[in-house]
């Protein structure tokens, strides 16, 4: 995303297209209908045979070709950024869901929806665990890789007494060895990948051993979910993502309180769109804290002189009304500046938590 954020504004139209690839109630995707409709409408507003129209038409053809060839591709969504005039074409398959189709046309890529997905669905490890087998996945906005660990299965005999006790000790030893191996592998993955979250779905008999053997630093990253009979990773990843989203929402209040305390004490915090934009210009922002609903942002009187020039066109499949383009542009300007300056981004789902400060604020690296 940092590469897209670093692109200079283009004199040609830059297309940012976000599509849900999930099927409707009759098993058919609706994204192609949306694409044809919005592209035809946008083309009518451009002068025929102009350089801008030529670039746009080539982008549309390339996007449609990509969608036709990747119609059966895995994933719940896709984000596509295209501008032939600026030699840009980037298609990003996404495992995370998108609520609605949306098209943005501007002088730069529109990154707010992608940044929101990345923050809401961070890269994390997920574990399916029982006493003799484990599957460890690394998920992000797409499924990245999987590792399977198989322990030795124990077979129960019909003998009782001393033989039964020996069997149980032997089984317990195998279970302990297997789970220790799982934890060792998980530790290596978490350290190598720099992961902050681990979601575990474990058999009832395995989880007490797993919890007991976890080192504290790893235990602090664990989110547990109930065990289900997930045959494939598809339903499993959806359940793990939902668990992370719930956990994230629970900590939103704490993050907003941290911001408010820093701001009110005159410390390392600013509140409101204008103050946050000014802090970005001075290189102060450590973490952007912004509403997950752009329509709840307070508009600014004037965008910074170095903001992306030109208008922003927005079309979505949302039937409840079109977005306020000035607020959408402001939200993207803030998020893009965060990625340009290596600032973290935190989206707050409950818009009311940031309502008193215009929907956005920032924790700072330093004061001036």
Regions found by a protein language model. Give the residues of each.
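Terminal alpha-helical anchor/extension segments at protein ends
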Residues: 1-368
């Amino acid at each position: 995303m940092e590469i897209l954020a670093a692109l200079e504004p283009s004199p040609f139209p830059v297309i940012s297209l976000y599509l849900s690839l999930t099927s409707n109630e009759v098993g058919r995707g609706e994204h192609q209908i949306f694409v044809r409709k919005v592209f035809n409408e946008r083309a009518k507003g451009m002068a025929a045979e102009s350089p801008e129209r030529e670039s746009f038409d080539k982008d549309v053809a390339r996007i449609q070709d990509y969608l036709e060839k990747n119609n059966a591709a895995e994933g719940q969504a896709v984000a596509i950024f295209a501008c032939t005039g600026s030699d840009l074409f980037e298609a990003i398959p996404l495992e995370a869901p998108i609520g609605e189709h949306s098209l943005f046309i501007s002088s730069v890529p529109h990154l707010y929806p992608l940044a929101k997905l990345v923050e809401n669905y961070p890269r994390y490890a997920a574990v399916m665990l029982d006493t003799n087998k484990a599957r460890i996945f690394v998920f992000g906005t797409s499924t990245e890789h999987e590792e399977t660990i198989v322990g030795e299965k124990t077979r129960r005999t019909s003998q009782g007494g001393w033989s039964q006790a020996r069997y149980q000790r032997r089984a317990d030893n195998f279970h302990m060895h297997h789970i220790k191996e799982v934890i060792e592998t998980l530790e290596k993955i978490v350290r190598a990948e720099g992961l902050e979250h681990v979601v575990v779905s474990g058999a009832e008999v395995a989880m007490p051993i797993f919890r007991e053997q976890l080192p504290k630093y790893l235990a602090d990253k664990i989110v547990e979910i109930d065990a289900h009979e997930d045959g494939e990773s598809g339903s499993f990843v959806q359940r793990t993502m939902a668990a992370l989203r719930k956990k994230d929402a629970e900590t939103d209040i704490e993050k907003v309180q941290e911001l408010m305390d820093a701001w009110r004490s005159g410390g390392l915090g600013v509140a409101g769109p204008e103050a946050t934009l000014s802090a970005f210009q001075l290189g102060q922002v450590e973490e952007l804290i912004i509403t997950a609903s752009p329509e709840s942002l307070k508009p600014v009187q004037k965008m910074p002189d170095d903001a992306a020039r030109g208008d922003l066109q927005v079309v979505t499949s949302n039937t409840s009304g079109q977005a306020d383009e000035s607020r959408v542009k402001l939200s993207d300007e803030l998020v893009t500046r965060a990625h340009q300056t290596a600032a973290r981004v935190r989206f707050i789902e409950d818009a009311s938590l940031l309502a008193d400060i215009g929907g956005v604020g920032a924790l700072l690296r330093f004061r001036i």
